[in-house]
Curated annotation (Swiss-Prot):
GO molecular function: DNA-binding transcription factor activity; RNA binding
Ranges for region Type E motif: 458-534
The PPR repeat ranges on this chain: 59-89, 90-124, 125-155, 158-192, 193-219, 220-250, 251-285, 286-320, 321-351, 352-386, 387-417, 423-453
Record's keyword annotation contains Mitochondrion: no
Protein family: Belongs to the PPR family. PCMP-E subfamily.
Organism domain of life: Eukaryota
Protein's name according to its UniProt entry: Pentatricopeptide repeat-containing protein At1g06143
Alphabetical GO biological process terms: RNA modification
Length: 577
């Protein structure tokens, strides 16, 4: 009874009862149809009112369907309250509520309900234990006791229940127990085999996973997809590709797994290539596929391909949900088309945290600091709770605008109002904010008060601030720290050399250059940029004239420099030597 102790009796508004009674016949078939068609919780309450009036709330079949409808609206308070009024709920009613508790993430209450079920002498079914084992994944201490009950009530060799047990043990990291259940099964279907293969994949034991899969009489798509996912997770792309190519039939999950795997391994061009190959094969992508491909376009900065993929979603009836929507906002922002990013964002019917984060990050990255902060304020007004990622973008915006006091206020709010613990990115953002504003010593003090060792990003931000504000004393401190963390990074050497040269400290310049020669450090990776024109990528590197159109490019640059000079722009060349 503990599961129901905190649920008050439901009071159904009288107007619901009158309106509903007047509009339909209260026979069970009609009520069953109405419950199935309920589109809002209020209509569900009206259906319950009609059931109570005619005592049909004692009808187990009707209550089974009613509880299922309550689950879809996450209104288990209605389901529980109604069940407590039933005189003799049967196993199907209990099973419906078990499923509801598991679906709505209330595992303990499902186990408490199981105790009541046994006390009421209602015999469990196989479906009962399938739901309860899933609940035990969230409360593992009940799992072993439940397994004893499974044997007690004669379900010890039930394939579906045993398969659920395998998944339960693997979810709690007990791979040996999972394999023991699998080995003791007198019969195994494809789902049981795939679940055990997935259990090995979950603990990254791909040798065992592959060995077990090879024992199957015939691998199915689900098993192969599981193996591909596992090898991609380990970065073994060659093995994943081999398995994929050997599959006689590839479903949408197979293709999407490859696309996601390439993206996770930063092989974005391959991810996009697989997507186009998938289209050639006539496989229709789903929302997961599309959002993954759009994200790959974002990482590559290929605006034209991103626009093509976006157009495909529009022409093929994809709903602009939060997943595709946030991916599009992120893609357009990273590809430099902020106007399109804003257009997508404002046209989203629903916006989740990822959508807000994407647009705030995009605005901040493009230098629209005030707009990013206004968007953050609007996000708070709409009661969307920011996360750690949100604040990284907000601190970037504050840095661009030089809003030190606002940055301090938001930093305190992050800790006090949202209980977010500062991570290295937050500290890096604040150090960058202080350093760029010339508060070098305050930035150094913040670094000293960090609860963990600062990384190269933080010391690099301080060093850059020292360059801007010509603080050579603190620059040398930051440089020495960086030499411990990243001694082969040429950028730090060149930055300090430029500061020494600016102050005519040529002996120090020679010393740093000598150290670089001893370590074999040189600027081997010049700055590069790329542009895509007519489906061709053009890559340009600093001082590189190998491009076929380099002469035309140089002429155009000269013209741009002349126009900039006429506009009053003065080049800063003091750091060039």
């Amino acid at each position: 009874m503990n599961a129901f102790a905190n649920v008050h009796s439901l009071r159904v508004p009288s107007h619901h009862l009158r309106d509903f009674s007047a509009s339909l016949s209260l026979a069970p078939p009609n009520l069953k149809k109405i419950i199935k068609q309920c589109s809002t919780p209020k209509l569900l309450e009206s259906a319950l009112a009609a059931m109570i009036k005619t005592s049909l709330n004692q009808d187990c079949r009707l209550m089974n369907q009613f509880i299922t409808a309550c689950t879809s609206f996450k209104r288990l308070d209605l389901a529980v309250s109604t069940m407590t009024q039933m005189q003799e709920p049967n196993v199907f009613v209990y099973n419906a509520l078990f499923k509801g508790f598991v679906t709505c993430s209330h595992p303990i209450r499902s186990l408490e309900l199981y105790v009541r079920m046994l006390r009421d002498s209602v015999s469990p079914s196989s479906y009962t234990y399938s739901s309860l084992v899933k609940a035990s994944s969230f409360a593992s201490r009940f799992g072993e006791s439940l397994q004893a009950h499974i044997w007690k009530f004669g379900f010890g060799f039930h394939v579906k229940i045993q398969t659920t047990l395998i998944d339960f043990y693997s979810a709690t990291g007990r791979i040996r127990e999972a394999r023991k259940v699998f080995d003791e099964m007198p019969e195994r279907d494809d789902i049981a085999w795939t679940t055990m293969v997935s259990a090995y994949r979950r603990v990254l034991d791909m040798d065992s996973a592959n060995s077990l899969a090879n024992q199957m009489s015939e691998k199915n798509e689900a098993t192969s997809n599981c193996l591909i996912n596992g090898y991609m997770g380990l970065g073994n792309l060659e093995q994943a590709e081999s398995l994929f190519n050997q599959m006689p039939v590839k479903d949408i999950i197979s293709w999407t797994t490859m696309i996601k795997g390439y993206s996770q391994n930063k092989r974005y061009r391959e991810a996009i290539a697989v997507f186009y190959k998938m289209m050639e094969e006539g496989i229709i992508p789903d929302e997961v596929t599309m959002s993954t491909v759009i994200s790959a376009c974002a990482h590559l900065g290929v605006l034209e391909i991103g626009k093509e993929v976006h157009m495909y979603t529009l022409q093929n009836g994809f709903v602009l949900d939060v997943y595709i929507g946030s991916a599009l906002v992120d893609m357009y922002s990273k590809c430099g088309s902020l106007e399109r990013a804003l257009l997508v964002f404002f046209n989203l019917p629903k916006k989740n945290l990822f959508c807000w984060n994407s647009i705030i990050e995009g605005l901040a990255a493009h230098g629209f600091a005030q707009e990013a902060l206004k968007m953050f304020a609007k996000m708070e007004m709409e009661s969307v709770k920011p996360n750690a990622v949100t604040f990284v973008s907000v601190f970037t915006a504050c840095t661009h605008a030089g809003l030190v006091d606002e940055g301090r206020r938001i930093y305190r709010s992050m800790i006090d109002d949202y209980s977010i613990v500062s991570n290295v990115e937050h500290y890096g953002g604040m150090v960058h904010l202080f350093s760029k504003a010339g508060l070098i010593y305050e930035a150094l003090e913040l670094i000293g008060n960090m609860e963990f060792e600062p990384n190269a990003v933080i010391w690099g931000a301080l060093l850059d601030g020292c360059r801007i504000h010509k603080n050579l004393v603190i620059a040398e401190i930051a440089f020495n720290k960086l030499m411990v963390l990243e001694p082969m990074n040429s950028g730090y050497y060149f930055l300090l050399v430029s500061m020494y040269a600016e102050q005519n400290r040529w002996r120090d310049v020679a010393e740093i250059r000598g150290r670089m020669r001893e370590l074999g450090i040189e600027k081997i990776c010049p700055g590069t940029s790329s542009i895509r024109i007519d489906k061709r990528d053009h890559l340009f590197a600093a001082a590189d004239k190998s491009h076929s159109a380099s002469d035309e490019v140089c002429l155009l640059l000269d013209e741009i420099y002349d126009q900039m000079g006429l506009a009053g722009y003065v080049q800063e060349t003091e750091n060039v030597y």
